[in-house]
Amino acid sequence: MGPYSLDDIRHTFSTSTDFNEIFDVFQAALRQKIDDVEPYRLLFWNQSLTPDEIRLFGEKLAAEFDTLAYDVYLWLASVFEVTSSSDDNYELALHYYMKASAIRPQEVDPYLDACDCYDPDLNIPPLMALVDFLRRGVDTVPRPDILYRRLAQLYDLAGDSDRSDWCRRKADEQGGTPAGGAPPVA
């Protein structure tokens, strides 16, 4: 089979409901060395694909183009965060935020985005898994005060005021006042 045009690839990724067709076009895109994340985003949002199929494509893409891996993992996380039809999807979102942070540990976005997907009513992803993730991040990001502030919020949700207060103090020591210049709320 000959090469596909970028328009053909986009069209298939966004509209096809046939897994075999999508897979064939995906394989062709890899052979053609298409390393622009944009058409693959369409693939990740294809409603006909199961979470396992989306993961298959995303993992293969990240392995094939290591320069795209960080963006691929962030996109996979956001897809699973938004498609919260099952509790597992929240945990998949956290899983991919963790993979993104492993590639670029100095980036704060995976940590903050993971916190944003937390649902306190359902405790998904598990609160303590988020806490552990952020605690690892404070040693790698250039502005740990940002993560300490989020940790303080998470500890508040867990009812642990001592650790919450400690994190607020660490945030103040590390970075001064929060974004916007306002003092922290007591």
Predicted regions and their residues:
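Helix-turn-helix repeat elements of alpha-solenoid scaffolds
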Residues: F13-N20, W45-F57, S86-L92, L122-M128
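N-terminal leader/linker segments that initiate helical-solenoid repeat arrays
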Residues: M1-V25, A29
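Inward-facing hydrophobic residues that define packing positions of alpha-helical scaffold repeats
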Residues: F23-Q27, G58, Y90, Y97, ...
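Acidic, Ser/Thr-rich low-complexity linear motifs
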Residues: R150, G180-A186
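Charged low-complexity stretches with an acidic bias
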Residues: K60-Y96, C167
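TPR/TPR-like (Sel1-like) alpha-helical repeat modules
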Residues: L94-A102, A129-R143, A152-A179
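Structural signature of alpha-solenoid helical repeat scaffolds
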Residues: E64-F65, S85, A102, L122, ...
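Amphipathic alpha-helical repeat scaffolds of TPR domains
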Residues: P3-D7, Q27-N46, D66-V82, P105-P120, ...
